[in-house]
């Protein structure tokens, strides 16, 4: 290998920590021009512990992606994904990673049976998805991620990572339709998940609820009657406020479409029957006296719709 190529390989090794650094060293252990070897200016541990805040160059990212694509070592794979994910938080690198063909390389890792690797891949895709152009490439993974959300261990880090990616991918209306067949499953996950899972599912549903094109799909989704427990006065505010906003958004979309909720044909057991039923009306009435001002205002805004 030439001197410039050796530098690139060693730089990539530095990024990945002690284990990956050794791997790269083995690949480049031959002498450089002049018989000298490149010595790292900083410890590899600094680069993987979050104390190294430099943005990687395009050349370093290219070597990192090559290593990620070619290695079978789970430790190196995980370190590479973490490093790529951290660098994907920078807008400049979001474009560079796409242009280097990095999105399919990262995306392939969500198929890993190693839950930690899968989580890190989802986190990296999540950061990359902030870039609108990147979303056009990430969209091919949306349906798989939806399927995996329901198969992943409940309340696990990998499940939350998947939900965060789906939330980012539904900030705009462009890809929300890809989730149409998964709304019932998301509502079920909302009910059985812990507080963190509930909040993340609600963030995702809130994105969908702002789009009039998704309103009918939301209201027709089958959901257990325990959904109304989200509107109990003792529910944590971070959940209660989002659940109320979900209801508000649906009402707003119906108004934009010039439709009345009671004119829409939905089956029993649907979200429609719960939101516009007598039990929910009573809950809104009770929340209108809630001590939290924000909760009270939202409940009062919803109450006249009954």
From Swiss-Prot:
Keyword DNA-binding: no
Gene3D superfamilies in the record: Leucine-rich Repeat Variant
Taxonomy, superkingdom: Eukaryota
UniProt keyword terms in alphabetical order: Endoplasmic reticulum, Growth regulation, Membrane, Mitochondrion, Mitochondrion outer membrane, Phosphoprotein, Transmembrane, Transmembrane helix
Repeat (ARM) residue spans along the chain: 101-143
Pfam families, per the entry: Arm_2 (PF04826)
Gene Ontology cellular component annotations, sorted alphabetically: endoplasmic reticulum; endoplasmic reticulum membrane; mitochondrial outer membrane; mitochondrion
Main location: endoplasmic reticulum
UniProt subcellular location: Endoplasmic reticulum membrane; Mitochondrion outer membrane
PANTHER family: ARMADILLO REPEAT CONTAINING 10, ARMADILLO REPEAT CONTAINING PROTEIN
Record text on subunit structure and interactions: Interacts with the DNA-binding domain of p53/TP53.
Protein name, per record: Armadillo repeat-containing protein 10
Source organism of this protein record: Rattus norvegicus (Rat)
Lineage of the organism: Eukaryota, Metazoa, Chordata, Craniata, Vertebrata
């Amino acid at each position: 290998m030439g001197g410039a190529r050796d530098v690139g390989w060693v730089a990539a090794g530095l990024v990945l920590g002690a284990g990956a650094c050794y791997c790269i060293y083995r690949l480049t252990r031959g002498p450089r021009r002049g018989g000298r070897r490149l010595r790292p200016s900083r410890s590899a541990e600094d680069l993987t512990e979050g104390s190294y805040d430099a943005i990687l160059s395009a050349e370093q990212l290219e070597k990192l992606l090559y290593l990620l694509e070619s290695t079978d070592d789970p430790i190196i794979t995980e370190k590479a994904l973490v490093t790529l994910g951290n660098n994907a938080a920078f807008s400049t690198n979001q474009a560079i990673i796409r242009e280097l063909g990095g999105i399919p390389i990262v995306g392939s890792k969500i198929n890993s049976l190693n839950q930690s690797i899968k989580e890190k891949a989802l986190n990296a895709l999540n950061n990359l998805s902030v870039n609108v152009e990147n979303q056009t490439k990430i969209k091919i993974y949306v349906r798989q991620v939806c399927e995996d959300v329901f198969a992943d261990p409940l309340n696990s880090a990998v499940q939350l990572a998947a939900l965060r990616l789906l939330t980012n991918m539904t900030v705009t209306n462009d890809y929300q339709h890809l989730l149409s067949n998964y709304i019932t499953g998301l509502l079920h996950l909302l009910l059985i998940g812990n507080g963190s899972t509930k909040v993340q599912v609600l963030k995702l549903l809130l994105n969908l609820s702002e789009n009039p094109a998704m309103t009918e799909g939301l209201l027709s989704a089958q959901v257990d009657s325990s959904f109304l427990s989200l509107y109990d006065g003792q529910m944590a505010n971070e959940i209660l406020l989002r659940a109320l906003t979900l209801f508000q958004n649906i009402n707003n979309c119906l108004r934009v479409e010039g439709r009345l909720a009671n004119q829409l044909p939905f089956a029993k057991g649907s979200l429609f029957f719960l939101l516009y039923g007598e039990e929910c009306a009573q809950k809104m009435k009770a929340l209108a006296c809630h001590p939290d001002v924000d909760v009270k205002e939202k409940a009062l805004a919803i109450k006249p719709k009954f």
